[in-house]
Amino acid sequence: MRTTFDCIVVGGGHAGCEASMALARLGQKVLLITGNVDRIGHLSCNPAVGGIAKGHIVREIDALGGMMGLWADKAGIQFRTLNRSKGPAVRATRAQVDRDLYMQAVKQDIFSQPNLSVWQDTVEAIIVKDGHTGGVKTALGQLFNSQYVILTTGTFLSGLMHIGQKNFSGGRLGDVGTSKLSSSLHSIGLHLGRLKTGTTPRLLKTSIDFTSMEMQLGDTPIPSFSFHGPKPSQPQVPCYITWTNEYTHDVIRSGMDRSPMFTGVITGTGARYCPSIEDKVARFADRDRHQIFVEPEGLTSQECYINGISTSLPLDIQLALIATIPGLENAHMVRPGYAIEYDYVDPMQLHPTLETKVLPGLWLAGQINGTSGYEEAAGQGLWAALNVFCKITRQEPFILGRDNAYLAVLVDDLVTQGTKEPYRMFTSRAEYRLLLREANADIRLTPLGRKIGLVGDYQWNLFQKKISDIDTLVNRLQNIRIKPDTLDPSIFLELGESIPNRAYTLEELLKRPSITFQTLRKIYSDLPITSEDVYLETETIIKYAGYLDRQEELVQRSAKLEHSYLPKEIDYTKVAGLSSEVIEKLQIVRPQTLGQAGRISGVTPAAITCLEIYLKKIHAFR
């Protein structure tokens, strides 16, 4: 049995699967250690991938050559484009996925991937050799050697589950966790905190009355995540919408005295943007109802996921509250909802590569860094893997700017500001979100994935054709002029647009708010035939040209700070004009650039000016 590897990945969740696949595909010998091989790629909470900002991350993973988009497209049973009526910056893809099909897709790739070995075991300690990572020790007494370890432990670090006043240890309902690894990380010098998340009851599909609910269908044509993979081919199924009511809320209030959240049993901080139903009822007392989505767990599954009633209330209260909800009056509970507390590492102890500052060779990715969500985890797994690969091959680190990717915003927020609650990505977190559209993730990132070696020939050729098609289409639109006497006035009147009184290029016409490519085809039938993606991206480039230019200008203005690097061993006590509070925060984060320093909470513009003056002095001295 092989015991030495180029990299060891601990944890078979979304971060671990993405990390191990990337490194193995890049030619590295990888060992993936997970506590339960049957649960590799398991969707622990809701059976869905994507959503606002999260869909952006999935597409960025795909653009770089990662896997999540391919797996979601294979297993998707309902696809929707969210915010379709809003601007291109916030439009996002979300897929309801078949839980079993998703795991099958992941495991098929994991077990067939050359260079990738899988071992079922529990990692209990990080081996340290001469101040560097040396490998891991497992519960079965195995010692695996590697200079590079990526920890992707999810909720399994000292996990403690709660249902009412009952609690039991584990990483997930039905799976054991680990407390010894927490102790090992603490002994290394990492500071751990405590977070909390939760999940909803699962109900028997045949016991639900769907006729009293609102049906929600997916989109046609079906959107997808991957720029280069097969289009979704699974049968598409509906979700359903229902609501809580005052009776539901009365039942919930009656159980608050036995809620682990409201009696102080749970000490970990929960997700602000994914509150439990008891938290929603307490915080929004003026609301007489809350929306619930009834989501299928899969095409052949007999369970439904009840999205919107995550809870850790006692079992009798869970049963009673479900019986008050329209359509669920006679529903049979298959699995209860529960909360889980777990350890995480303060991410300000990480470099922007996600390598720990205290122990070279140890990387962290996913919920261990304080994030929530499959997509955020998968993105960190890929980010960590690419940086491990760069370190092994002695290349420059793989670090992107906040104007390049949501992945960069995510990592920069974590390592610069840290988090005291589960971090979730939103489009509002990105200051350059119009540049970071879901639709142009390939344009932003595929050349980088190709350069590092993760984007294959097929994906690269498709990308190059797309770029060529966009260039050709833009050129045609700029050079084709339409005279007013050749136009059908009714086309413009129907849209509420003024009738052109002079010759216009097709580009000028497309800039009008109500005119789309569908309209242009009526005006000029000889447009190049290409994919819908090319039409949409071209339309965005032309319609939003002014806004895009303005964001590019903002990027250029901040570029000076982003490229002003701070010395690694800088002593901030020697920088004149800095307050003790600012010095303390700079010493903790150790920012790499002035731009990153400026994003640290409490570091003022005046402090940045002091740092600029200091840099000028030391550069002049040299």
Curated annotation (Swiss-Prot):
Binding site for NAD(+): 270-284
InterPro entries noted in UniProt: FAD/NAD-bd_sf, GIDA_C_N, MnmG, MnmG-rel, MnmG-rel_CS, MnmG_C, MnmG_C_subdom, MnmG_C_subdom_sf
Disulfide bond entries: none
Positions contributing to FAD binding: 11-16, 123, 178, 367
Domain of life: Bacteria
GO molecular function, one term: flavin adenine dinucleotide binding
Broad class of the protein's primary localization: cytoplasm
GO biological process: tRNA methylation; tRNA wobble uridine modification
Localisation per UniProt entry: Cytoplasm
Alphabetic keyword roster: Cytoplasm, FAD, Flavoprotein, NAD, tRNA processing
NCBIfam families named among the record's database cross-references: mnmG_gidA (TIGR00136)
Assembly, per entry: Homodimer. Heterotetramer of two MnmE and two MnmG subunits.
Record protein name field: tRNA uridine 5-carboxymethylaminomethyl modification enzyme MnmG
The gene coding this protein: mnmG
